[in-house]
Amino acid sequence: MSGIERRPSPSNPKLSEVTIPAGVVLFSEGDRADAMYIVQQGEINIAINQGSHTLATLEKGASFGEQAVVGTKYRMATATANTDAVCLEIPADWLGRQISTAPPLLKTVFSALTLQLLQRNYIASIAHSDAGAGEFVIESGGPAEHAWSNFSRGSTLNSVYCSDGGAIQNQLQSGRALIVSSGKLELRRGSARCALGEGAVLGLAEVLAGVPFDDAVDVLSSVNAWAVDGDAAYALVFKLNKGLYGVVKGFVGRVLGDGKSLGRLAQTPQ
């Protein structure tokens, strides 16, 4: 992290402002996660596959790194300053304390959003490879297993049965996201095709934001899944303090992708 400087934040001396020169890496994919960040000045690139594929370019007000802090504990992407940049650094222990006192449904949402982001990153890597198809697998000891363990251990959600893609689309169009507990499906995004099984997350970021689910889904073997009511989850999120609301908003923005509408999450609670 050569060239990176830290100093107390003028607005909150308990936190640090981090200055990152253009081209310098703040953290790399696979690093242990000990903080999240909010861009104050400049631009930050978020990339996967050892920095070879850029997922997003973040500007002032955007948050990043929260997914690893609350979900996987290890960085899922590489953050590099696209220009000279200044970021507010928020330690993992602060975020952990905020989440530990939050309602159980919020903890469930964080774990499931982490899985959805890992899934999105994997599909993005397929789309930019020669293969064009792959299978998202929850690997033992990996970040997805950590998030799945947290989700399945604490879940008290209702379960639904879907025999085909139409049944899944009906759930999503009714504002319910699905987290697969058994069965198998194929998700198609553009030219990329991805097989998914246990731990697949469909539409959570979308129902929180109140925006359409754009991917096509085929059921390969009948699916049982937990359902998350988007309106109920959003109502809970909207009552959070501004800091945690911003974390959820940033999370959803990463999952939906650069340039996509944040829908009702674009508004800020008073």
Model-derived regions: residue spans:
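Cytosolic regulatory regions built on CNB/CRP/Popeye-like sensor folds
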Residues: 1-270
